[in-house]
């Protein structure tokens, strides 16, 4: 089996193993946006919140989409993934055609003037973060898998099935993991 930590890099999905029971990360799918010797940053893709972006963030009145829980770190910060790095200054390309961050005032203006559509952005409250060596230790414990990411996965609203589909896409023994009950004792 491949050492999955070795292939982890920005643009990869981080999939919680079935053994990871931490309520912050149980059956989560994260997009890794930064991964280096200092640590890692990612955003949980399958945890929409009950709040709409337009209700929670000023300046984004046109976004009638759910705000997402990006992770348990700095939950007073807002982050955005989008497909419009061509018009947003300071955006960092994570995978081809998918960007992280950029000038929020410019983003607000472009959304409110119709240049950017709500379907091209996803907002996150907080992020998932690991210090140097922390994520590697979690991989050694068997807490995580990796998979390739796509823009479609980031912008899907099929939250309930995202984890099982992403794990199943790895094939082989992962198909069994993807089909395992959330509470094995209830099997």
Curated annotation (Swiss-Prot):
InterPro entries: AlgH-like
Domain of life: Bacteria
Family of the protein in this entry: Belongs to the UPF0301 (AlgH) family.
An example Gene Ontology CC term for this record: cytosol
UniProt name for this protein: UPF0301 protein CT0663
UniProt xrefs under SUPFAM superfamilies: VC0467-like
Organism: Chlorobaculum tepidum (strain ATCC 49652 / DSM 12025 / NBRC 103806 / TLS) (Chlorobium tepidum)
């Amino acid at each position: 089996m491949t050492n999955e930590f070795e292939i982890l890099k920005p643009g990869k999905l981080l999939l919680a193993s079935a053994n990871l029971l931490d309520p912050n990360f149980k059956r989560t799918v994260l997009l890794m946006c930064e991964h280096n010797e200092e640590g890692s940053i990612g955003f949980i893709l399958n945890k929409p919140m009950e709040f709409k972006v337009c209700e929670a963030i000023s300046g984004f009145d046109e976004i009638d989409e759910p705000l997402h829980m990006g992770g348990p770190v700095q939950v007073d910060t807002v982050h955005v993934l989008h497909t419009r790095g061509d018009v947003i200054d300071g955006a960092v390309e994570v995978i081809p055609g998918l960007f992280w961050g950029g000038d929020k005032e410019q983003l607000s203006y472009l959304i409110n003037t119709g240049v950017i559509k709500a379907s091209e952005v996803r907002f996150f409250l907080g992020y998932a973060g690991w210090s140097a060596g922390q994520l590697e230790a979690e991989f050694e414990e068997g807490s995580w898998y990796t998979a390739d990411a796509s823009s479609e996965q980031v912008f899907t609203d099929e939250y309930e099935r995202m984890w099982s589909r992403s794990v199943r896409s790895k094939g082989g023994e992962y198909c069994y993991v993807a089909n395992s009950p959330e509470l094995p004792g209830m099997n």
